[in-house]
Amino acid sequence: MLSNHRSTVTLLLGGVRSGKSHYAQQFGERAGRVVFVATAQATDDEMRRKVDRHRSSRPKDWQTVEEPLAVAEAIALHGPTCDLMIIDCLTFFAANLLDAKADEQISIDGLCHALQSPPCSVVLVSNEVGSGVVPEYPSGRRFRDLLGEMNQSVARVASNVLLLVAGLPLVLKGELVPQVSPRVSPQVSQ
C-alpha cells in the first residue's frame, strides 16, 4: 500500500486554444508517474495531425492510454499505477458517447463515481461551450447540452475547477496550483 498521498481531482475548463492542455501538462511535470488518457479518435487528417502534435509535446516517459469511451474504467485500471492521470479531453469523450449512442447519464455517473475516491490525482480537460453561439442543428445543441451537463457533474466532485482564458488560469473552485506529489512507498525495515 502506498502512503503519504492525497488524491485531488482538478477540472480545467476553457475555450479552444485557451491553454488547457498545456496547463494540464504542467501538472504532470511536477508529478512522478503520469498516465495520459487520450479520448480523441483520429478520424481524419486534421485530427491525426492534432493528435500527433499533442503526443509529441508529452514527455516520453508518460504512459499514454487511448480510451474514447471507457474513461471511468481507465481510472480504475490505470490509476493505481501512477501519481497523476491526465484525461484530455471530456469534449471528445462527450462526442464519442453521442457517436456510439451510449447511455450518456450512466457514463457521466460512472465517471463521477470513479472521481469521488480516485486511486491517483486526476486532471481533466474540457471545453467550456456554453458561452458560444447557439448551434444551428439539433445534434450540435445536444452535444453542447451533454458537455455542459458533464462539466457541471465533474465540477461538483472536483476538488479544484479552473477556467483558462488566454493561457491564464482563473480559480472557480479550490486552489490555483493544487499539489500533485508522488506517492511514497513505505520504508521496509531491515
Q: Where are the predicted features?
A:
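Short, well-ordered beta-strand core segments
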Residues: V34, M85, N160-L163
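Short, high-confidence coil segments that cap the C-terminus of an alpha-helix
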Residues: S7, A31, P80-D83, P119
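Conserved P-loop
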Residues: L2, V9-L77
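Structural motif
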Residues: L11, I86, V123-V125
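Residue-level signal for inorganic ion chemistry
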Residues: A24, H54, I86, N127, ...
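Helix-adjacent hinge/juxtasegments
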Residues: K60-I106
